[in-house]
């Protein structure tokens, strides 16, 4: 649930944005199209059957996808993330400040063509991995690894661990340890919260977990 004073809206405000826009795991959730290599690149479109089930059908890929790699393993798949690119561009067009996105990212689309597609096209249900993306529509989240080469060029790309270190997480942990040590004999709720900074930081900085997320920054002076 949102804290008080926070309002959910369907679109960006129709006015300049001065400050910082933060998007946490947004880009991977935006709708994407699916390219499949079958001797050449094709687009997988979804068809609905009379019984309500869904299946894929391959059609000729749009000519604007000519930037895809000329060759790939048979059956390779990659996401086409036009909506994510448009969202970033829309924010930057209104922004005087910084856009900061945290997400699962890959530098090049071609990298995804060489790995099993279910490693990057993921579904989640109840915070657990879900089933095939065509099953249980509306009951599971469908996400895709974000391909940075499909987005407007960012100003800075760092791991989440590097980003947090850059902005002082080590100092916050040291402060938490010091306050806990000073009050360990008679702990309070406040001191327990300070102690929890240690384990929370370990989780946020773990490169095999959350620390491996990518922090992508764009700075935009477009609006004055």
What are these regions (language model features)?
Residues 1-18:
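SAM cofactor-binding core of SAM-dependent methyltransferases
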Residues 18-19, 97:
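Conserved acidic residues
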Residues 2, 16, 49, 165, ...:
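Generic detector of intrinsically disordered, low-complexity, polar/charged segments
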Residues 9-12, 27-42, 80-90:
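A short, conserved alpha-helix within the catalytic core of class I
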């Amino acid at each position: 649930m949102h804290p008080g004073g926070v309002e959910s809206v369907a679109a960006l405000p129709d006015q300049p944005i001065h400050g910082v826009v933060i998007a946490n795991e947004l880009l991977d959730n935006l709708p994407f199209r699916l390219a499949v290599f079958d001797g050449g690149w094709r687009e997988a479109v979804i068809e609905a059957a009379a019984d309500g089930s869904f299946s894929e059908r391959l059609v000729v890929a749009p000519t604007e996808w000519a930037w895809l790699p000329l060759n790939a393993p048979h059956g390779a798949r990659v996401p086409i993330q036009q909506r994510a690119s448009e969202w970033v561009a829309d924010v930057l067009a209104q922004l005087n400040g910084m856009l900061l996105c945290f997400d699962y990212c890959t530098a090049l689309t071609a990298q995804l063509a060489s790995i099993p597609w279910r490693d990057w096209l993921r579904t989640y249900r109840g915070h657990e991995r879900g089933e095939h993306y065509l099953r249980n529509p509306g009951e599971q989240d469908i996400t895709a690894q974000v391909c940075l080469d499909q987005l407007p060029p960012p100003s800075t790309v760092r791991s989440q661990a590097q980003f947090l270190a850059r902005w002082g997480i080590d100092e916050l942990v040291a402060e938490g340890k010091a306050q806990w040590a000073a009050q360990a004999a008679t702990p309070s709720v406040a001191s327990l919260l300070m102690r929890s900074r240690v384990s929370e930081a370990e989780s946020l900085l773990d490169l095999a977990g959350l620390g491996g997320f990518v922090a992508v920054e764009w700075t935009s002076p477009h609006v004055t």
